[in-house]
Swiss-Prot record:
This is L-2-hydroxyglutarate dehydrogenase, mitochondrial. InterPro entries: FAD-dep_OxRdtase, FAD/NAD-bd_sf. The keyword Transit peptide applies. GO terms for molecular function: (S)-2-hydroxy-acid oxidase activity; 2-hydroxyglutarate dehydrogenase activity; FAD binding. It holds the Pfam family DAO. It is an enzyme of class 1 (oxidoreductase). Its cofactor is FAD. The gene is L2HGDH. Disruption phenotype: No visible phenotype under normal growth conditions. It catalyses: (S)-2-hydroxyglutarate + A = 2-oxoglutarate + AH2.
Length: 483
């Protein structure tokens, strides 16, 4: 049976930048009723007219304390089974997988909805698994994740298309690098890879110019928002949200067990009696004060730190976790420009140059609506990771002058690109574990066997191919860390 997610009830809309820009806007509580400081009473969704009820368990005006010391006993405590911190695509995938396996999951995110940061600011590409060292987590999860992702998209009618990719060498000096990519892809068991002479590639794509190309037929594109929305729907029994000041229910009546708490920031935590204690607050409440104040103490059996850009900063605020196990943070901003003044996309396939330092190069993608995007570039950002919320930390504006560097790079493989045809699109920040002139780092997934903290799983450096790998990462966490 096919399942198709409903999207009309949500205000997150295309184009992508309009949706992604929500990260810089004030929280809108009309979109979703936050459950911070409240206990959800689950009612059967078997009824034709399901009802809802909320039981207040904390009066924030009377029970707030500072930090995690002293009067911490005065705030409400809530024992929960599993907490997933971060409602990006990986966090959503983890929450879904754990809930499918019978765990009660609470998903916390500082934003007012899911997927507002890195997950909404990328190329929306399904990667085949070519670029990564054999036996690395990136290689393993990308290949497995691609299989799971295509299967999921087909089953639930998520818009996607396996359009293929050409990685191109535009000069003879780049051919050895292309050969290396072919070798890596073969080692990673990526099927269908084929080396093409320049004329063969240009026969496929007449606007292309190259001397050689690597064809990856398994690469593709998908609608990331529809995918994330589906993950949300597959994680919970029902969701309460506000629509014109009326409370409504939305979601499929499935027997999964997950609760979403948006506008919720994890201030800090500590290990006590082999349990992680988390101290949380309403994002808007905490950001309005110089010193953040906890409003609720959560005591979970399992914590998955999937906070993306904020994962390391959060880990450093968990007292009892040795900071030696927290890798350094590096942030790389990537800008995208859209192609204007065209009647039809110049390419049918994804076209990628030879990878550059810090990224895969300024490539061309065509989304499912026919919008042609070029990017991202790489701009290293000097930044510290000592803040509790990343909602307004980064500047996502695209400087139109950056297009001056795009034109010569793109014209290496697309010489007919016209002056003035690039318009600022959007930008994203990549959570990297390696900096400039350093070798690319692998994903880091840590459990108790690494850092010694019971019930804590840290996910660090989940950059590309994080979207493609999301379902495989979730599968791995469920298989390895569920007891």
């Amino acid at each position: 049976m096919k399942h198709k997610p409903e999207t009309a009830a949500f205000s997150l809309i295309r184009p992508l930048e309009a949706w992604a820009a929500n990260a810089n806007k004030a929280c809108n509580t009309k979109k979703m009723l936050p459950c911070l400081g409240r206990k959800w009473m689950r009612l059967s969704t078997r009824n034709l007219k399901p009802t809802w009820n909320l039981i207040n368990v904390v009066d924030a005006s009377k029970t707030i304390v500072r930090g995690i010391s002293g009067g911490a006993e005065t705030i409400a405590k809530e024992r929960v089974d599993t907490v997933v911190i971060g409602a990006g695509v990986v966090g959503l995938a983890v929450a879904r997988e754990l809930s499918l396996r019978g765990r009660e999951v609470l998903i916390l995110d500082a934003a007012s909805s899911f997927g507002t940061v890195t997950s909404s600011r990328n190329s929306e590409v399904v990667h085949a698994g070519i670029y990564y060292p054999p036996n690395s987590l990136k290689a393993k999860f990308c290949v497995r994740g691609r299989e799971l992702l295509y299967k999921y998209c087909s089953e639930y009618e998520i818009p996607h298309k396996k359009i293929g990719k050409l990685i191109v060498a535009t000069g003879s000096s780049e051919i050895p690098k292309l050969d290396l990519l072919m070798h890596l892809g073969t080692q990673n068991r990526v099927s269908g890879l084929r080396m093409l002479e320049g004329f063969e590639a240009m026969r496929m794509e007449p606007q292309l110019r190259c001397v050689k190309a690597l064809l990856s037929p398994e690469s593709g594109i998908l609608d990331t928002h529809s995918f994330m929305l589906s993950l949300v729907e597959k994680s919970f029994d029902f969701m309460v949200y506000r629509d014109n000041n009326n409370l409504r229910l939305q979601g499929e009546a499935q027997n999964n067990h997950a609760t979403f708490s948006y506008n919720t920031v994890v201030l800090n935590g500590r290990v006590e009696e082999k349990k992680m204690h988390l101290y949380v607050a309403d994002t808007r409440f905490s950001e309005s004060r110089c010193e953040a104040e906890a409003q609720l103490e959560l005591i979970p059996n399992l914590v998955v730190n999937s906070a993306g850009l904020g994962a390391q900063a959060l880990a450093k605020r968990l007292h009892g976790l040795d900071h030696r196990f927290v890798p350094s943070s590096h942030y790389a901003r990537g800008c995208y420009f859209t192609l204007s003044g065209i009647k039809a996309p110049p390419f049918n396939k994804l076209v990628y140059p030879i990878p550059e330092e810090g990224g895969l190069g300024v490539h061309v993608t065509v989304d499912l609506n026919g919008l042609v995007k070029f990017g991202p570039d790489v701009e290293w950002i000097e930044c510290t990771d000592d803040t509790s919320s990343f909602l307004n930390k980064f500047d996502y504006r695209v400087n139109p002058q950056r297009s001056e560097k795009f034109y010569p790079e793109i014209r290496k493989y697309y010489p007919d690109l016209k002056d003035g045809s690039l318009e600022p699109g959007y930008s994203g920040i990549r959570p990297k574990l390696s900096g400039p002139k350093q070798s690319p780092a692998d994903f880091v997934i840590q459990g108790e066997e690494t850092h010694g903290v019971p019930g804590l799983v840290n996910l660090f450096g989940i950059e590309s191919p994080g979207l493609t790998s999301s379902l495989a990462i979730a599968e791995h966490i469920a298989n390895k860390f569920l007891r």
